A protein has these predicted regions:
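Hydrophobic faces of well-ordered beta-strands that scaffold small-molecule active sites
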Residues: 57-59, 89-93, 127-131, 204, ...
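Substrate-binding cleft/loops of secretory-pathway carbohydrate-active enzymes
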Residues: 207-308
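Boundary/entry segment of secreted carbohydrate-active catalytic domains
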Residues: 2-96
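Aromatic-lined substrate-binding rim segments of carbohydrate-active enzymes
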Residues: 78-164, 233-252
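Substrate-binding cleft of secreted/luminal carbohydrate-active enzymes
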Residues: 258-262, 270-381
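Extracellular/luminal regions of secreted and cell-surface proteins that mediate adhesion/ECM remodeling
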Residues: 372-493
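Active-site groove signature of glycoside hydrolases
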Residues: 158-182, 186-227
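Conserved, mostly hydrophobic/aromatic
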Residues: 91, 193, 206, 244, ...
């Protein structure tokens, strides 16, 4: 897949829209007669923390080192402390393959995985996962021993030099041969995971993972690859992507937009992922402009997960730039520029709730602001009321998005009553409402139902891969504990 500009690029229509609502035009007078000249209700933007599918600050439970081991704390205490960090609405783990499978045909999870999944239900914070096939920051191989018995390892051209006290500079980062055994074991592992977690309440997203360091599709700074040809490399990577896409039918996949440095066809995986309605991520922000173009000009229905470390390797040093700005705050400002749905709460190779709190206490403003803007924050800024010739009432919702990102899927609006006598609605086009502008959509009320009844409420949901998730209305007033909005006239005219 050649490099291309992402602005205006044709990635297809995006996710299917079921029960599409009428979204205009809305002429006020003859011959249209929508009579939307007078506003019935208005809302103002809220500042509450929003926890819903497709967005949020995401606390890292594990990065490259597996279990977050902190002296003086049990593993449960450490993970619980990370879950309790108030700004985080999701968590993330990045285990090595050997941490979840020890033998063929069966998954056996390390304790930190099991604790994380249990606490995700306890705290209502879903989990993003990536299973690494190759990890440069450990000396042992990320692959399980039973896989290594059938899969040769190969050295690529080049070397990676740096501080010899760091593990990544102490070995040669051998790459596995992508033979039939590896592909077969990979498919088995994906199917076993999906059998347990596909569509379950614990999982938010799954990273695609295949060739290279961290499974991101590159082996920088090493040159080339260990495939017979570039064509074979692309075919193998697409095969691994297709295995994941087939297994995870109810969970969005997330592909890193890392440039195709080793010419293995990773760019084709990115393209396929977008066309299939999946999402994107980037694990460094102040880097290649190719990645920045992709993320900032992606289709509105594609979520963007930005990863950045808030501190240095020991978790307590906070680098500043030449102008004196904390590097973490600089990254956050660029995360907003990239219209991010997710951002990592990550203290690099020193994952520890104490380190997370220490950074937050020193630099609270940028994180607080991001928590109130990350992702999408939808509400009906205007609600107009009109009537059909047969007397049935219409509500026209002027939907706005006070966040920084589009809706990564399809937004469904439903007008309902608590007693179930009214339940009617439908969907906006994929990705709407965008962060700027208004998306108008009309819902016709059942015969005999009036907006003035005082019983009507508006509920929002996001549909991702055919699964619906509740979306709280992000308004400053009139919002119920379940996230719905009371439909009550508050505009006189």
């Amino acid at each position: 897949m050649p490099v291309h500009n992402w602005t205006g690029y044709d990635f297809g229509p995006g996710p299917a829209v079921r029960d599409r609502l009428y979204q205009g035009p809305f002429g006020c007078y003859e011959p249209d007669n929508f009579y939307g000249g007078w506003c019935y209700q208005s809302t103002q933007p809220g500042k509450q923390l929003i926890n819903c599918m497709g967005m949020g600050l995401i606390t890292y439970i594990s990065g490259d080192f597996g279990a977050p081991l902190v002296p003086g704390k049990t593993l449960e205490e450490t993970i619980d402390g990370l879950f309790r960090f108030p700004l985080g609405t999701k968590v993330y783990i990045r285990p090595n393959w050997r941490h979840i499978q020890k033998r063929e045909g069966k998954l056996e999870f390390d304790d930190y995985w099991k604790i994380t999944m249990e606490m995700s239900l306890q705290y209502d914070k879903r989990v993003g996962i990536r299973v690494m096939l190759n990890n440069p920051d450990i000396l042992e191989n990320a692959l399980p021993d039973f896989v290594l018995k059938k899969v040769p390892l190969h050295k690529l051209k080049g070397s990676w030099t740096g501080n010899p006290s760091q593990v990544r500079y102490q070995h040669e980062h051998l790459q596995p041969e992508y033979n039939d055994y590896l592909i077969g074991y990979f498919e088995e592992m994906q199917n076993l995971l999906a059998e347990q977690y596909n569509g379950g309440p614990e999982i938010e997203m799954v990273d695609t993972h295949h060739f290279g360091l961290w499974g991101e599709g590159h082996a920088w700074p090493y040159d080339g690859h260990n495939f017979k040809s570039r064509k074979e490399a692309e075919e193998k990577l697409l095969k691994m992507y297709e295995i994941q896409q087939k297994a995870w039918t109810k969970v969005p996949l997330v592909t890193n937009v890392q440039p195709d440095y080793n010419r293995v066809g990773h760019s084709s995986v990115i393209d396929r992922s977008v066309r299939d309605g999946n999402w994107l991520r980037r694990d460094s922000i102040l880097v290649q402009n190719e990645c920045i173009d992709a993320l900032s000009n992606r289709p509105a229905w594609v979520a963007n997960f930005c990863e950045g470390a808030m501190s240095s390797g020991n978790g307590t040093d906070y680098p500043v730039d030449a102008d004196g700005f904390a590097r973490g705050d600089v990254i956050i400002s660029h995360v907003k520029d990239l219209k991010a749905n997710y951002y990592s709460l990550w203290t690099f190779h020193a994952i520890n709730p104490d380190n997370l709190w220490a950074y937050y206490k020193k630099y609270p403003d940028a994180l607080n602001d991001l928590a109130q803007r990350i992702g999408f924050r939808v509400r009906p800024s205007w609600i107009w009321r009109s009537s059909d010739p047969d007397g049935r009432e219409n509500l026209i919702f002027g939907m706005v998005n006070d966040g920084i990102a589009g809706v990564p899927g399809v937004l469904r609006l439903t007008v309902f009553t608590d007693d179930g006598s009214v339940e009617t609605g439908g969907c906006l086009d994929a990705g709407f409402p965008h962060p700027k502008g208004i998306r108008e959509a009309m819902i016709t009320l059942p015969e005999g139902v009036s907006a003035n009844s005082g019983r009507l409420k508006l509920r929002a949901e996001i549909e991702v891969k055919g699964v619906r998730y509740p979306v709280p209305i992000a308004a400053a007033h009139g919002v119920n504990p379940d996230g719905s909005l009371n439909i009550i006239r508050n505009v006189n005219g």
